[in-house]
Amino acid sequence: MANSNLPRRIIKETQRLLSEPAPGISASPSEENMRYFNVMILGPTQSPYEGGVFKLELFLPEEYPMAAPKVRFLTKIYHPNIDKLGRICLDILKDKWSPALQIRTVLLSIQALLSAPNPDDPLSENIAKHWKSNEAEAVETAKEWTRLYASGA
């Protein structure tokens, strides 16, 4: 770990992520930049994303922990709170961020969002409309996208 200029907090959080990974989540720092993490989240059971492996990138800005990490999905996903660029609509990544939160909390919250899509606070209007007008069909589309784009990522 080339961590010469990293704040202690980032080093400690990284060590904990590696030694005690959260169930269904792996996050490993890049060799070149310890503020950049390659993340994999398994689709939660009993969700439309079950069986999927979703790749994300997480970046800790210079201001971290005073500013939230930047996180986005690299794997295509059909979800009302995630747009086609992989950006995530999650309160703790925006106005509800607190320095008391950690990388682990953020990743667990994203995993929970996969279990409980919220079409009332959408990032993708079209998917949210689909979810609200015909949830069963939207869930089927999400399952199909999971099979197409997230199987064995």
UniProtKB/Swiss-Prot annotation:
Family listed: Belongs to the ubiquitin-conjugating enzyme family.
UniProt pathway: Protein modification; protein ubiquitination
Molecular function GO terms recorded: ATP binding; ubiquitin conjugating enzyme activity
Gene3D superfamilies attached to this UniProt entry: Ubiquitin Conjugating Enzyme
Domain of life of the native organism: Eukaryota
Protein name: Ubiquitin-conjugating enzyme E2 36
Extra remark: Partly functionally redundant with UBC35.
Catalyzed reactions per annotation: S-ubiquitinyl-[E1 ubiquitin-activating enzyme]-L-cysteine + [E2 ubiquitin-conjugating enzyme]-L-cysteine = [E1 ubiquitin-activating enzyme]-L-cysteine + S-ubiquitinyl-[E2 ubiquitin-conjugating enzyme]-L-cysteine
Gene that this sequence comes from: UBC36
Keywords attached to this entry: ATP-binding, Nucleotide-binding, Transferase, Ubl conjugation pathway
